[in-house]
C-alpha cells in the first residue's frame, strides 16, 4: 500500500501511529539533507512507534476489528491465491448458464499438493466492487462453488475456501434464482465430501453468505477477521431500531476471532503481521500458507470416513453461549 493510499484509508485509531511515523520520516529526511547525525533520537522515536503499535493493535475492540476486516486494502481471495499458490487456473460458470464474479474459484498447487481454492471476491474500487457485487454472491456463485467442490472430490483434491462477504446477495433476483436453496444444498453436500476441507475467514464472515462455503474439517480465522450471524449495523437496527448502536451490537454478537475460539465456533486463529494484513499483505499470506499446510498435513492422516464423521460431529456440537446483558 502506497503512502498516499495509507493516508486516504487511515482508520481513526491508527492516526496517532501514523503521525508519529510521519514525524520519524521527516526527521530522517531532514537529517540526510543537512548531513546531521540524529540516530539516537530516531532510535528513541522508532522504539516509541513500536510500543504504540503494540498498544493499539493488542487492545482493539470488536468495532475496530470490524473496521480492519472491511479495510479497502485488506488482501482479498485473489490476492492470497496469487501469493501462496502456484499454477492457479480460474474456472468459471455453474453449468447452468451463469457465472458470478463475486465468488471465484479454480485449481492450483499449494506446496506439493493440487488443491481446489474458492472464495468471495470484493473489488478494489467502486467500479470493481459494483462488478463483483461487493463480494455478495448470488445463487449461481454458490452453485459454481458446489461444482468446483464436486470436481475436487472426484479427483481427490483438498478444498480450501476463503470467506470474505458481508452476506449473500439479498436482491429479488437472487430470491427468484433460489438463494436459500443454493446455500442449503452446499451445506448438505459439504458434509458428504470425502476430501479434506479447510475454511478460512479472511475478512468479513457474514451470515448465510459465509456458511455457503463454510462447512469444513477446520474453520480458521485471521486475527482481525470477523464472523457473525448479522452485521452489527443490522443487529442494532433490529434490536434497538438504531443502526448507530452498532458498537454495542458488535460486542454482544461475539464477532471476533478470540470470542469465537472461546466458544469453539472456530478451530484456530491465524496471527496477522504488525499493523494488520493490509499493512503487510505478503507477511499475512505467509502466515496463512503456513497454517493451511499444517492443517492439510494433519487432515491427510485421517481416512475419508473419519474426516466426515469429525466434520459432522463438529457442527452438531456447536451451541455454547455466554449470557450477557445488552
Swiss-Prot record:
The keyword Lipid metabolism applies. InterPro entries: Acetyl_CoA_COase_a_su, ClpP/crotonase-like_dom_sf, COA_CT_C. Pathway: Lipid metabolism; malonyl-CoA biosynthesis; malonyl-CoA from acetyl-CoA: step 1/1. Residues 44-298 form the CoA carboxyltransferase C-terminal domain. It catalyses: N(6)-carboxybiotinyl-L-lysyl-[protein] + acetyl-CoA = N(6)-biotinyl-L-lysyl-[protein] + malonyl-CoA. Its EC number is 2.1.3.15. One of its GO terms (cellular component) is acetyl-CoA carboxylase complex. Keywords: ATP-binding, Cytoplasm, Fatty acid biosynthesis, Fatty acid metabolism, Lipid biosynthesis, Lipid metabolism, Nucleotide-binding, Transferase. GO terms for biological process: fatty acid biosynthetic process; malonyl-CoA biosynthetic process. GO terms for molecular function: acetyl-CoA carboxylase activity; ATP binding; carboxyl- or carbamoyltransferase activity. The keyword Transferase applies. It is found in: Cytoplasm. NCBIfam families: accA, AccA_sub, PRK05724.1. Component of the acetyl coenzyme A carboxylase (ACC) complex. First, biotin carboxylase catalyzes the carboxylation of biotin on its carrier protein (BCCP) and then the CO(2) group is transferred by the carboxyltransferase to acetyl-CoA to form malonyl-CoA. Belongs to the AccA family. Acetyl-CoA carboxylase is a heterohexamer composed of biotin carboxyl carrier protein (AccB), biotin carboxylase (AccC) and two subunits each of ACCase subunit alpha (AccA) and ACCase subunit beta (AccD). HAMAP family: AcetylCoA_CT_alpha. This is Acetyl-coenzyme A carboxylase carboxyl transferase subunit alpha. It comes from Synechocystis sp. (strain ATCC 27184 / PCC 6803 / Kazusa). The gene is accA.
Amino acid at each position: 500500500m502506497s503512502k498516499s493510499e495509507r493516508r486516504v484509508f487511515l482508520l481513526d485509531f491508527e492516526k496517532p501511529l501514523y503521525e508519529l511515523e510521519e514525524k520519524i520520516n521527516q526527521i530522517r529526511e531532514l537529517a540526510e539533507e543537512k548531513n546531521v547525525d540524529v540516530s539516537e533520537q530516531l532510535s528513541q522515536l522508532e522504539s516509541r512507534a513500536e510500543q504504540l503499535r503494540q498498544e493499539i493493535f493488542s487492545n482493539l475492540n470488536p468495532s475496530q476489528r470490524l473496521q480492519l476486516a472491511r479495510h479497502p486494502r485488506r488482501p482479498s481471495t485473489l490476492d492470497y491465491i496469487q501469493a501462496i499458490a502456484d499454477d492457479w487456473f480460474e474456472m468459471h460458470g455453474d453449468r447452468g448458464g451463469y457465472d458470478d464474479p463475486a465468488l471465484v474459484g479454480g485449481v492450483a498447487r499449494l506446496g506439493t499438493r493440487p488443491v481446489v481454492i474458492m472464495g468471495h471476491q470484493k473489488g478494489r474500487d467502486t467500479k470493481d466492487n459494483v462488478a463483483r457485487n461487493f463480494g455478495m454472491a448470488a445463487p449461481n456463485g454458490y452453485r459454481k462453488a458446489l461444482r468446483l467442490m464436486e470436481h475436487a472430490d472426484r479427483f481427490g483434491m483438498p478444498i480450501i475456501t476463503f470467506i470474505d462477504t458481508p452476506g449473500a446477495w439479498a436482491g429479488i433476483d437472487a430470491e427468484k434464482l433460489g438463494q436459500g436453496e443454493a446455500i442449503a444444498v452446499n451445506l448438505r453436500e459439504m458434509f458428504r465430501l470425502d476430501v479434506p476441507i479447510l475454511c478460512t475467514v479472511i475478512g468479513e464472515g457474514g451470515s448465510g453468505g459465509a456458511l455457503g462455503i463454510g462447512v469444513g474439517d477446520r474453520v480458521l480465522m485471521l486475527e482481525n477477521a470477523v464472523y457473525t450471524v448479522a452485521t452489527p449495523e443490522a443487529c442494532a437496527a433490529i434490536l434497538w431500531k438504531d443502526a448507530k448502536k452498532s458498537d454495542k451490537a458488535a460486542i454482544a454478537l461475539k464477532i471476533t476471532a478470540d470470542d469465537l475460539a472461546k466458544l469453539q465456533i472456530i478451530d484456530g486463529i491465524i496471527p496477522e503481521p504488525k499493523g494488520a494484513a493490509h499493512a503487510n499483505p505478503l507477511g499475512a499470506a505467509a502466515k496463512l500458507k503456513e497454517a493451511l499446510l499444517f492443517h492439510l498435513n494433519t487432515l491427510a492422516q485421517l481416512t475419508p470416513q473419519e474426516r466426515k464423521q469429525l466434520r459432522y460431529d463438529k457442527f452438531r456440537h456447536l451451541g455454547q453461549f455466554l449470557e450477557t446483558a445488552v
